């Protein structure tokens, strides 16, 4: 009997909390090869240094509907020359209904970027290859850890402000 009551509560909670992907799209992208065509005539082996910068932001666009934008900037340098620079703003529109403030923050700051990253990675790989360079496959990113780190930094900053 107690088991039935627990299952019913779980079922009701599951019905209340709803998550749906409404749309995934490229909001903005840029590919630059500032040192072409000379970068292709290099005699040195292709072993560039890569720099990846990630950020994400979100905004509420309607009741229970949010846009999340994952921004990636990848810079490849060969020696002191920039081989290429890729910037992608991969976006998604998500319907989130019935979540508490903490859960909503985690979904928008971690779960949604996790959904968007494979799409952004594909755009980066495609642009780099079409730009005449060897394929670039970005490693997976732990957005849960990044979100936790960001929350910890916010709490530390808040605690520092209170002390002053």
Swiss-Prot record:
Record carries keyword Repressor: no
Subcellular location, record wording? Cytoplasm
Q: Which NCBIfam families match?
A: PRK05751.1-3, PRK05751.1-4, PRK05751.1-5, secB
Q: What is the gene name?
A: secB
Task: Answer whether the UniProt record assigns the keyword Magnesium to this protein.
Answer: no
List the protein's name.
Protein-export protein SecB
Q: Which UniProt keywords apply?
A: Chaperone, Cytoplasm, Protein transport, Translocation, Transport
Question: Biological process GO annotation list?
Answer: protein folding; protein tetramerization; protein transport
Q: Which Pfam families match?
A: SecB
């Amino acid at each position: 009997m107690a088991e039935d009551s627990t299952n019913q509560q779980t079922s009701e909670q599951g019905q209340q909390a709803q998550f749906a992907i409404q749309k995934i799209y490229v909001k903005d992208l840029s590919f630059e090869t500032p040192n072409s065509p000379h970068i292709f005539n290099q005699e040195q082996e292709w072993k560039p240094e890569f720099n990846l910068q990630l950020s994400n932001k979100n905004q509420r666009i309607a009741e229970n509907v949010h846009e999340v934008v994952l921004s990636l900037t990848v810079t490849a340098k060969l020696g002191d020359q920039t081989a290429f620079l890729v910037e992608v703003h991969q976006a998604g529109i998500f319907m989130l209904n019935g979540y508490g403030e903490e859960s909503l923050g985690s979904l928008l700051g971690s779960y949604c970027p996790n959904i968007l990253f494979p799409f952004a990675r594909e755009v980066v790989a495609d642009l780099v290859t079409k730009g005449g360079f060897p394929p670039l496959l970005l490693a997976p990113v732990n957005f849960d850890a990044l979100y936790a780190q960001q929350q910890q930094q916010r709490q530390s900053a808040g605690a520092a402000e209170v002390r002053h």
